């Protein structure tokens, strides 16, 4: 159904763009555009008010059960238990907990598949406040206005589908041009002490406002949207003590660049990074958000800062004084207990200390965000490693570094370059984080500073950070270098070229490096040549935490739901969106003699498994996007990407074509991964695509948290080698069997049998991390099937527990009773917390 056009004049009308913007059509809705929060409208304020009213009671119950000092992360986790009557000391890194988030969110590439899965539930509306932000599908090319015009036309089908779903089921809808989702959430939805789920790995950005926000796949999000329990392995806790105060060129970005180098891309797996210490109070809220955002690059579940005055200032500046007033009432419990801060090693699983006063700016890369280099070492490292020295593009922005403060610090460097007659040698692109920031920067004359250096100001969208970039500078077929204030620099991520060496830095360092155009330049020590031939040294950057005149008022952007019974039909010719058919359930038999699809060597991120760029528009069409499966995965047997052996045709082809051949001939297959397989983004397509192409098993040395969860939710058996050395036993033409599946159980290994080409066999053990409920998901074949079974088997939901009554009751006395027939058939399907309303259809 085509919805009426909505003028984006209010989104893009600025001093420089009003004439060009005119009226850009979008497919959002005919509903009223809501102004931004500074006008006094706080979305879902009743929910926030109830949260702060109940928080002390819930925390008292937690303290009564645990009887010990608590970290901030523990306070939020335990007060969000779905079944507080089952409260106990959950073992970190081992036990699973069921949680009840406060908010949810998604975007235009994670949203379609999540909503497609939600449609199968039969629910009439979502069960918790949620928002859809269209930020991923805008292709960066000519600039904000022309790029948004192209996006509206080329992404019509996706935007229309999301807008209809939002209007019908209850999502707030932010059309393209409104901002990058994490900045939109920070400005409008995040609040201290709350919990949020979003289908994006950089969701932890909200930790800058003291919110526990976690990136998930679409199936996990649907759990929350349906009011069901959302399950998480109880995270370990990494405490990061910050002391001192940042000096000179050092920025919040350098805190996380250094920390990522310390922890590596897997050091935070199944852990929450919690910052504490007096150094936290010297950082702005958006600076904290930058640090939390990129904590995802360590594999961390999320990151969080304690509530403080900087958060108050930010909330007030974005129209949320009422939230500040509520948070102040529980402020002492929006941070770790004093005993924890005094003796952190006793309460955190690992403690890292960073002295902000001595922190040096960093440049991390290339090809991995944990390749950390203090800026004083970059020149020597570049020459040692043979990095291409010329910087061909400088990119400022992304969800990591697009706040008002970020852009003002970069603008101060740019202004000095203009004033001192320094010519820029590298093309610059600037991405403000939201329309509010865009218009405020425009009002304050700061975007014109960049334009004077011939910078391209892009739309408030993800753009080059996720590969949505029509790059026209330099020759990408040869090794080349770019520098960016983004969060990830995996091969091929930004421009699709695996030859591009991408380096991560703060916005001000990126701006300074653009002047010399050389990765070996150190702006702290080096000089630049002015037009008059003088050697000029750049002064330290200066920025503004928040705009002195406040943010621009009356910024429109949000379309509110109307709950109309809009038709959600999808045309069979729609290339962007197609509804799902249920995957087949497990047949009860062992997997026997399955062919190896690929044995991946080295780093294999979700960008390798399901690349972005040109494929992003097809995230809502599982058949179409499955053509990119493991396009960038390196085959351990030939060292090449996109070339694997087909055991049936006896020829090499792409992983997608080989998997599709097997599927068409009713043959399942196996993927073997290296260490930290599936690190990076939360994209569930990296699990859904192999499931769709009948991959039955993923066996790896280790699995990244979100990807492992997505594999489980999509019905793929996710295994790890009991002995990582067994990875070397697997040969290219092996047949792989997984034995003992009829007896698979929590904490019990399975047997892997290899049948080599010569007929010889080898056996070894593999581990899994499934609990009883997750095994039932796997047996059922996929989560939507699980939801339907759950409705069919569940008993009426119990009344929601009274937290106050739980303080002295033992956990054993609070266990739920489950009908015996249900337990016998599906031990994991306990009473369902609210699905006795007849809204789910039977199988």
At which residue positions do the language-model features occur?
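N-terminal export signals
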Residues: 2, 10-30
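C-terminal segment of N-terminal export signals and the immediately downstream linker at the start
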Residues: 26-60
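Long, structured ligand/cofactor-binding scaffold of large enzymes
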Residues: 55, 60-233, 626-671, 676
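Non-catalytic terminal/interface segments that mediate subunit docking, oligomerization
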Residues: 118-120, 350-441, 565-697
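Accessory "access/gating" subregions that flank catalytic or transport cores
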Residues: 163, 175, 180-194, 298-424, ...
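Mobile "lid/hinge" segments at catalytic clefts and subdomain interfaces of large enzymes
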Residues: 199-322, 468-552
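Phosphate/diphosphate-binding loops
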Residues: 329-340, 441-527, 702-703, 714-749
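Acidic, glycine-rich flexible loop/linker segments
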Residues: 528-545, 707-777, 781-786
């Amino acid at each position: 159904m085509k919805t009426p056009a909505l003028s984006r004049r209010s989104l893009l009308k600025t001093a420089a763009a009003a004439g060009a913007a005119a009226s850009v059509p979008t497919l959002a809705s005919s509903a009223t555009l809501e102004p931004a929060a500074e006008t006094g409208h706080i979305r879902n304020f009743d929910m926030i008010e109830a949260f702060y009213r109940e928080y002390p009671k819930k925390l008292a119950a937690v303290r009564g059960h645990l009887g010990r000092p608590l970290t901030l992360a523990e306070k939020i986790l335990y007060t969000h238990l779905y079944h507080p009557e089952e409260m106990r000391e959950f073992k970190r890194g081992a036990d699973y907990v069921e949680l009840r988030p406060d908010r949810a969110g998604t975007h235009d590439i994670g949203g379609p598949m999540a909503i497609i899965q939600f449609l199968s539930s039969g629910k009439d509306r979502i069960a918790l406040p949620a928002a859809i932000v269209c930020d991923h599908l805008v292709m960066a090319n000519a600039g904000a206005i022309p790029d948004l015009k192209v996006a509206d036309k080329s992404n019509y089908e996706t935007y229309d589908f999301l807008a209809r779903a939002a209007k019908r089921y209850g999502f707030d809808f932010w059309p393209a041009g409104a901002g990058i989702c994490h900045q939109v959430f920070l400005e409008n939805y995040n609040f201290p002490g709350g919990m949020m789920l979003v289908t994006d790995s950089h969701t932890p950005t909200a930790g800058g406002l003291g919110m526990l926000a976690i990136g998930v796949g679409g199936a996990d999000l649907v759990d929350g949207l349906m009011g069901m329990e959302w399950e998480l392995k109880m995270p370990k806790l990494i405490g990061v003590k910050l002391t001192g105060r940042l000096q000179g060129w050092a920025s919040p970005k350098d805190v996380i660049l250094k920390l990522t180098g310390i922890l590596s891309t897997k050091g935070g797996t199944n852990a929450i990074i919690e910052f504490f210490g007096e150094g936290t109070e010297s950082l702005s809220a958006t600076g904290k958000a930058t640090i939390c955002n990129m904590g995802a690059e360590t594999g961390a579940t999320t990151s969080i800062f304690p509530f403080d005055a900087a958060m108050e200032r930010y909330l007030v500046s974005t129209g949320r004084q009422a939230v500040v007033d509520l948070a102040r009432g529980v402020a002492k419990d929006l941070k770790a207990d004093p005993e924890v801060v005094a003796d952190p090693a006793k309460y955190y699983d690992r403690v890292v200390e960073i002295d902000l006063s001595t922190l040096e700016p960093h440049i991390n890369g290339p090809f991995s965000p944990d390749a950390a280099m203090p800026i004083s070492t970059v020149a020597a490292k570049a020459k040692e490693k043979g990095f291409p020295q010329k910087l061909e593009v400088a990119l400022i922005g992304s969800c990591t570094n697009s706040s008002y403060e970020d852009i003002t610090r970069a603008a101060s460097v740019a202004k000095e370059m203009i004033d001192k007659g320094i010519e820029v040698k590298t093309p610059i692109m600037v991405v403000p984080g939201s329309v509010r920031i865009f218009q405020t920067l425009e009002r304050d004359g700061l975007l014109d500073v960049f334009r004077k250096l011939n910078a391209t100001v892009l739309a408030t969208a993800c753009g080059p950070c996720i590969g949505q970039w029509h790059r026209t500078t330099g020759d990408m077929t040869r090794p080349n270098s770019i520098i960016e204030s983004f969060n990830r620099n995996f091969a091929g991520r930004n421009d699709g070229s695996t030859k591009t060496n991408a380096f991560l830095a703060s916005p001000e360092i990126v701006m300074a490096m653009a002047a010399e155009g050389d990765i070996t330049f150190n702006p702290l020590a080096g000089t630049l040549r002015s037009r008059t031939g003088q050697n000029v040294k750049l002064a330290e950057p200066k920025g503004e935490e928040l705009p002195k005149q406040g943010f621009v008022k009356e910024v429109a952007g949000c379309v509110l739901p109307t709950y109309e019974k809009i038709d959600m039909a999808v045309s069979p010719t729609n290339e962007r969106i197609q509804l799902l058919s249920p995957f087949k359930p497990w047949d009860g038999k062992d997997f026997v003699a399955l062919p190896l699809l690929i044995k991946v060597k080295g780093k294999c991120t979700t960008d390798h498994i399901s690349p972005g760029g040109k494929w992003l528009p097809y995230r809502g069409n599982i058949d179409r996007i499955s053509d990119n499966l493991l396009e960038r995965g390196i085959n351990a047997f030939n060292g090449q990407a996109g070339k694997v052996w087909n055991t049936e045709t006896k020829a090499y082809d792409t992983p997608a074509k080989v998997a599709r051949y097997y599927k068409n001939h009713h043959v399942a297959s196996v993927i073997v991964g290296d260490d930290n397989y599936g690190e990076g983004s939360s994209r569930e397509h990296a699990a859904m695509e192999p499931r769709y192409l009948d991959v039955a098993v993923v066996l790896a040395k280790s699995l990244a948290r979100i990807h492992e969860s997505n594999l489980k939710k999509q019905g793929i058996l996710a295994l790890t080698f009991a002995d990582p050395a067994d990875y070397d036993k697997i040969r290219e033409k092996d047949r792989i069997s997984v034995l003992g599946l009829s007896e698979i159980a929590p904490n019990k290994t399975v047997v892997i049998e290899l049948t080599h080409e010569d007929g010889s066999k080898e056996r070894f053990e593999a581990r899994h991390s499934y609990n009883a409920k997750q095994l039932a998901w796997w047996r059922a074949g996929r989560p939507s099937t699980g939801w339907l079974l759950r409705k069919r088997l569940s008993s009426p939901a119990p009344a929601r527990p009274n937290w106050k009554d739980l303080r002295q009751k033992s956990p054993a006395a609070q266990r739920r009773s489950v009908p015996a027939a249900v337990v016998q058939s599906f031990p994991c399907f306990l009473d369902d917390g609210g699905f006795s309303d007849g809204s789910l259809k039977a199988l």
